[in-house]
Amino acid sequence: MGFLQFIPNFARMRDNNEEIFPIVDDSGKVLGKATRGECHNGSRLLHPVVHLHVFNSLGEVYMQRRPDWKDIQPGKWDTAVGGHLDYGETPEEALRREVREELGITDFTPKNIGLYVFDSKRERELVYVNSAIYDGEIHPSQEELDGGRFWTMDEIRDAIGKGLLTPNFESEFQRFFLNNPVQG
């Protein structure tokens, strides 16, 4: 690959720190807006994200592998779909957009599971947790993900605490699904 062919791919291999996110209170009420960079620089501005846990009819859980170029938790296994709300977007709109972009799925019925605040040293997220049962084809985005696969509940239990999964996934999965696996 020549140098000029590499440039477009390299440009995609990082997050856009100028994206505009809503800043919210812990009930989801919009208070203002900030860039991705401002939200992820340790300011701990509370911003909303959507998650979709995809189960198949066997009770297995689809997980994505985060690309190594991601600014948060690179190379770890994570929730099937996760993404930020754009400023002016509803959680439902963001969920459908992210599922289409990340997994190529358009025909699914999400179930709202819960809402919580995730705190880390770098950021604070208001997480809208959803699940769905889905047995159709999944086409993970080659630009946004490093693939994905279905995991059994035993595989997830064995991986917890070993540095393979994102801390956010571990805490969320234990909170909402480990003792009640299929909530689609």
Regions found by a protein language model. Give the residues of each.
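Short, surface-exposed beta-strand-loop junctions and turns on beta-sheet-rich folds
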Residues: E38, W69-D71, G147
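Active-site segment of metal-dependent pyrophosphate-handling enzymes
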Residues: P48, L58, D68, T90, ...
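Active-site acidic-Proline motif in GNAT/NAT acetyltransferases
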Residues: G83-E89
